[in-house]
Amino acid sequence: MEVLIVNESKHAAPRKFIQTWMQLVVTELKRKKVLKAEQARRELTLVFLDKKPAQKINMEFRGKNYATDVLSFDSMDPGSLGELVLCPEVLKRQSKEHGLTYQQELGYMLLHGVLHLLGYDHETSEAEALEMFGIQDAAFEVLLKKVSAK
């Protein structure tokens, strides 16, 4: 999967971590048969925004007037898996709340966003939420071990 990073925030995007993490995500989701080989060949765009623009997009597309950690947008381009919009300020705050490093929180939300792009939705039903978070948490545990081993 080719990952394009567009950083429009005042925070540096950890590009090397993102590239390594996303390679591991692809491998793990293919292993779990959640990601098809054809989907793994698509491009993924990551956009990093500061709080105000992230809040504006969240309001426009979800009707929620606050900046959120990650938003996912499907693509009409058959060569693209979609786009994830992330807010580093929210991720940094959440990492402290969750007892994770910033990169771990970013990794968790990248995984979360990719699952949304693959059709998983935790807001539709409790059963779907359990399925999505089950996949996400199990994959995250495996991925953390692989990243710390590198």
From Swiss-Prot:
Protein's UniProt keywords contain Transmembrane helix: no
Binding note for cofactor: Binds 1 zinc ion.
Keyword presence, rRNA processing: yes
Main location (coarse class): cytoplasm
Positions with a binding annotation for Zn(2+): H112, H116, H122
GO cellular component: cytoplasm
Entry EC no(s): 3.1.-.-
Gene Ontology process terms (BP): rRNA processing
One Pfam family hit: YbeY
NCBIfam families referenced in this protein's UniProt entry, alphabetically: rRNA maturation RNase YbeY
Assigned protein family: Belongs to the endoribonuclease YbeY family.
HAMAP family: Endoribonucl_YbeY
Protein name: Endoribonuclease YbeY
Source species taxonomy: Bacteria, Pseudomonadati, Bdellovibrionota, Bdellovibrionia, Bdellovibrionales
